[in-house]
Amino acid sequence: MAFAMRPEWKDEPVSTTGASYVEPSATDLIKPGRRVAHLFPRSVMEEYVLQRVTERVWWVSRHFYGSLFYVGTRGVLLLDPFLGGADATVKAVASVTDLPVTAVVYSHFHADHVGGARRLFELLASAPPRVIASENTAIWMERFGSDLPWPTDVLEWPSGSLSFEDVTLRLRGLPRPGHAPDHAVFLLEEERVGHSADLINIDQLPFGGFAGQDPLVLFKPNLEFARSLEFDWFCGGHGNIGEKSDFDFYLTYLDEVAGLVNEYVPRPEVVPDLSLTDYLGGLDEASRSRLLTGLDNHFGLYLYGRQIAAGHPPAGGGGNPFMSGTIGEWATERKEAVDAAVPRIIERLRPTYGRMYNFDDAQPGNVRLMAMAIQPSLTNR
């Protein structure tokens, strides 16, 4: 039965790629240029959303998280057992096959995407699946001392692979991981389907904070790398099921935002040398001696040095040691310029993007982040 929208609910956002919305189907393959309809209210109201992607691959979504599973001839390969979704995912798998889940892939070691493995293994206790992950993920889990099921099959970074029945699972580590040190794309090669959680939100504007991409200036190269890979369909761990057109949209949007940032808050032509210790050279001997009387380390000097040198007692708390003196003054000036520019940039974006998913809620912060990311600072200039 078709999902029924209610008059009092907010209208569905428009597609970022101009896609047509269709009811999800566990039997019919989704066609190019189509996306699953009413995904946000479905995520609130329904147990899970299931869409067939290829003859052997399904996309499953629950509570704003998404993953893929491949149905072989002897078992099922599941990519990302996201937190809170194990029972629903097992139910979704069982709705299309009687075969058991025999292998699980961790896309990266963030518990919201793989933390459901604990519950999944409880459900599959009679025949626990193997766990596949990159060596970067395996090392990180070991160092952290994770209590999640550990990888049994470790893929060499950045491009290891293994066979799961008739499909090749290929790791393609991102060239400049910013979201996590093990951030990667996984490909089901013969099916031409890709998966990378937290790289792109399909059919949505970028998530608030760009999902923690850091440094933000390296986000675009990672998107370009992922787009260059061989796939027809892609799961981003959040949002809809999508295609390369979703990557094209992201790249275009980032370029447009960057262009507006450079228009409204360009880098100043003259940037001072930003230093935490620029004042030391101008101190007399008594002031230097006062510093050595009150301090025995340069972290403390960053916190309190200017106050002590001026003859004042150190202020409680100390603030951010890397925002003292001229650096703090510079950062405050640039932040004020960015804060003034963001509302104007948002209104320039609104005619094209204003009806898209999370425009008013997430994009002001994203524009601010992008603007600050290109400003010279202590570490970048």
Please state what every model-predicted region is:
Residues 78-81, 102-110, 132-136, 194-197, ...:
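Active-site neighborhood of phospho(di)ester-bond hydrolases with catalytic His/Asp-centered motifs
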Residues 86, 109-116, 138-141, 179-182, ...:
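Active-site environment of divalent metal-dependent phosphoester hydrolases
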Residues 217-293:
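Divalent-metal (often Zn2+) His-rich catalytic cores of metallo-beta-lactamase-fold enzymes
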Residues 6, 91-163, 260:
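Active-site HxH/HxHxD metal-binding segment of metal-dependent hydrolases
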Residues 2-74:
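Zn-dependent metallo-beta-lactamase
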Residues 132-175, 180-181, 189-190, 220-225, ...:
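Metallo-beta-lactamase
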Residues 2-19, 274-381:
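C-terminal regulatory/interaction regions
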